[in-house]
Swiss-Prot record:
Its EC number is 3.1.-.-, 5.6.2.4. Residues 26-488 form the UvrD-like helicase ATP-binding domain. Heterodimer of AddA and AddB/RexB. HAMAP family: AddA. Its cofactor is Mg(2+). InterPro entries: AddA, DNA_helicase_UvrD-like_C, DNA_helicase_UvrD/REP, P-loop_NTPase, PDDEXK-like_dom_sf, PDDEXK_AddAB-type, Restrct_endonuc-II-like, UvrD-like_ATP-bd. It comes from the Bacteria. Residues 515-802 form the UvrD-like helicase C-terminal domain. This is ATP-dependent helicase/nuclease subunit A. Gene3D superfamilies: 3.90.320.10, P-loop containing nucleotide triphosphate hydrolases, PCRA, domain 4. GO terms for biological process: double-strand break repair via homologous recombination. The gene is addA.
Amino acid sequence: MKLIPFLSEEEIQKLQEAEANSSKEQKKTAEQIEAIYTSGQNILVSASAGSGKTFVMAERILDQLARGVEISQLFISTFTVKAATELKERLEKKISKKIQETDDVDLKQHLGRQLADLPNAAIGTMDSFTQKFLGKHGYLLDIAPNFRILQNQSEQLLLENEVFHEVFEAHYQGKQKETFSHLLKNFAGRGKDERGLRQQVYKIYDFLQSTSNPQKWLSKSFLKGFEKADFTSEKEKLTEQIKQALWDLESFFRYHLDNDAKEFAKAAYLENVQLILDEIDSLNQESDSQAYQAVLARVVAISKEKNGRALTNASRKADLKPLADTYNEERKTQFAKLGQLSDQIAILDYQERYHGDTWKLAKTFQSFMSDFVEAYRQRKRQENAFEFADISHYTIEILENFPQVRESYQERFHEVMVDEYQDTNHIQERMLELLSNGHNRFMVGDIKQSIYRFRQADPQIFNEKFQRYAQNPQEGKLILLKENFRSSSEVLSATNDVFERLMDQEVGEINYDNKHQLVFANTKLTPNPDNKAEFLLYDKDDTGEEEESQTETKLTGEMRLVIKEILKLHQEKGVAFKEIALLTSSRNRNDQILLALSEYGIPVKTDGEQNNYLQSLEVQVMLDTLRVIHNPLQDYALVALMKSPMFGFDEDELARLSLQKAEDKAHENLYEKLVNAQKKASSQKGLIHTALAEKLKQFMDILASWRLYAKPHSLYDLIWKIYNDRFYYDYVGALPNGPARQANLYALALRADQFEKSNFKGLSRFIRMIDQVLEAQHDLASVAVAPPKDAVELMTIHKSKGLEFPYVFILNMDQDFNKQDSMSEVILSRQNGLGVKYIAKMETGAVEDHYPKTIKLSIPSLTYRQNEEELQLASYSEQMRLLYVAMTRAEKKLYLVGKGSREKLEAKQYPAAKNGKLNSNTRLQARNFQDWLWAISKVFTKDKLNFSYRFIGEDQLTREAIGELETKSPLRDSSQADNRQSDTIKEALEMLKEVEVYNTLHRAAIELPSVQTPSQIKKFYEPVMDMEGVEIAGQGQSVGKKISFDLPDFSTKEKVTGAEIGSATHELMQRIDLSQQLTLASLTETLKQVQTSQAVRDKINLDKILAFFDTVLGQEILANTDHLYREQPFSMLKRDQKSQEDFVVRGILDGYLLYENKIVLFDYKTDRYDEPSQLVDRYRGQLALYEEALSRAYSIKNIEKYLILLGKDEVQVVKV
């Protein structure tokens, strides 16, 4: 069809007016209409939380398709695979609806083609696009298309370590080994090895991977801070700060003398106050920096006289105490600032003195990093395995260096769209620039929700365009979506109240003004005073505890507060548990939260990413078992294995065995002592009684058999042999939380199998890999198990982004911000490059022998201090945005939960607000969310804030006050009469006589098989057959049935049956790792694991499998793996119509997606067919059985059923 012109500004305005005057219940806002229809220039849509940005994107795409644009001409980048799937589903519905509504034949045909092409559209993450791009164009850089992605963190770490040690050895033995040795020692710390340097190298490498060209950034920007260091300018800045601080101090003391000092006329401290004022008065306009520094030194010295009490107002008069306390508090604040400035003078002097040495160290570091980056890049090319960032770098390299490729994409894409633009990093931004023609970008995001700085996302990319487009519309169009269609007015008012007073350009990176404030738009939610946001504080004064370290007890109090509110919502207001979310900034306290909820019987569902897999007890036992099999001379691991439930040695037995040392040896490992005990070669052999000797023999025999088995067999087989030999898998299944424990053990075997499939072989390397993961303080993700259906959601704020819940509790408001980055030896900045702490060796000048002649001094470089200030502002801004995301998840009511001493919090004093914002020092000195909220509550008391605070003490949190969860026992009342045995043998004999009569009457029931499979009874549902049940099911077992025998086939060619292909295909679909990007190479590797012959493998069409995952259903499965269940066995009781007897149906479901209110069931079929309807009729009954089983199991009636037909050249997905 011909392209239909896009709307002009005048036409858009008319559309806005028509919409405003329409009688629609839910109208589009003027800004939404503008965002949907504006064209011909770059557009930035700043979409606040809940403003309908996904709706706008979908409508804009639909409008462009309706005007003749092809879906293949749109590049649409989403932040997650799930978001891409949801957008495709939304588009599928909208396009289908448009086709039904229009009478235009050309448009119908055009939209029909777009619907067919939708699965292949460029809608997805940047990672998925770059993978496909490199697969297609990688040959330009000599990259084979069958590359794989290094998604396994342990494998990546192993490769990284190997390359690091190679580069390390080359530098350690190279020409510059002396300067390199200095670099090594600079980061060695107490460890005195390479680990400190390695940690910093990996940190810098991760940062480099987020740049569009790592080597270029290393050469151009890494040393930028050293090159532009200006100590004269820094001294001038410091002098200005000293000048201002001294003036502030003078103003404070003069005010005190003029107003309050008369109350303390004879106080000794006033003489020292006058001395300080005299010192400050000695300064004038001609005073230089030296003079200011000298006065500062004398003022600080005076304050430290009399053990620091020279300026303290020590008045004890009750009526004057508040006045004295206020003076003393302010004086401390003033001198704390002066003390910091005094320290900065000394630090700046050291920085200048050691600047040359630090720069030399940085150059050595730059050389090492350059070699490491290149060596690691080459190693990954040899392995043909890359990180996602590598794929992006190669994509950029091709687009930059091959104009014909770049121009073909620029010509192809009518528009380059990106969602969640605030979380874009510099690689992605460069790629978007290269794909665009310069004026066809559509960017949607919200800088207030940029919370992925730890992944190198840079909100300033968004902010720079926001400011530029706002100032100059010729640069691009800025559209603001402020209306919130998600939350109640109470939630929005509270959020606005907080951020209007908290966030500005100085601290927060944006000014929270009318461009960013949330506007209530959900007319379905009427105002309700009960939904006013609450700031709940557990009062620590009531606990009687003084130890700050006793966090567990205090958190329990906070959690009891939360549990009380949850039970109130659930039992008094009828709120389902699944409508409640508990949000945390980190998972550090999740164990205590889960324990508290469990104690009160409240069901909970976590976000499934605990990342404490290696810390689970059952996995630790297995890892120690593998360590012992590899090397039994490891005492800790050996004791752990012996004490484990697999062998159950107690302390007494281990003590007896540990005393079995040979007389002629000074030291022996425990294993050697066990050998001595078996040989009775110790003087303490009398301690080994018969029972212990037999137990020891069994242990040693089993251990020897495992060690022997490990040599020729795979890790997977070894692990399962251990499980089976000692019934350990079954044992953990009987423990509390058994299914999760078994899932962990099952995952250990699978991870070992994946490890060996990744070109890494052997028990030794597997153990080394695990130890490296633990050493790096990393962990593997815990294994998910089926969550309860109605449960409170516990998740991190990061995980909650994009979600919404009626009731939201933000927990741990008192948890301190993570400032680990600011304590690092290295801080990086895109503007300044490397900031580093330099370890200087200084002479002390000490004469006495007991004093050290030299000391080591850690001196932060000038760039380090600059980067530290930049990092502090960026970190606080990110924490503000994190709080914003958390608060805007709530639909109805918001609870902010913290704890603290009421007395101390009420006594806190804060500087006055400035321009309606908290004082910048108040904001920058906050340690947690609670400090911000409390300061706002106190400073803006008169403003009638839309959230209230209240303290809850122990007296309100007793077990009786909290209450209990009302539960009904599922057990029926039992009657002992039902269990009485016959009193006499006579009664038993009479019962036996009745058996024959009973058997005759119920012959049909006796002949009914007690267990049947869906394939046996699917014939019940075939329209040409009898529906009676027993007779049909019994046909397969009929005595009168003719028996036929196949003649033997003597041909040498291996025959492959359809059943074999079907079984192998099912096993393949079960084994596919859906957490990784699916490629032909990864499927080929998975196919090798399938237990079948090579002839069968050759018959399986992997392209067809890949094609399935490009369908709408396939994409839905990939995007919802946390809801996915594969190869699930089931049993179901059914009643036979003829005999009226129950029988069991057993089968295995190929897979299903379990959502809250629906289930998507799918079944693979490899049968040959002419028309899909043939298989639909054939398997309709079987799917009906599956549907019944799922419906009974989950009490869900909405079940979608699909057949995935693999019997033809092209895969077909048919809804039944």
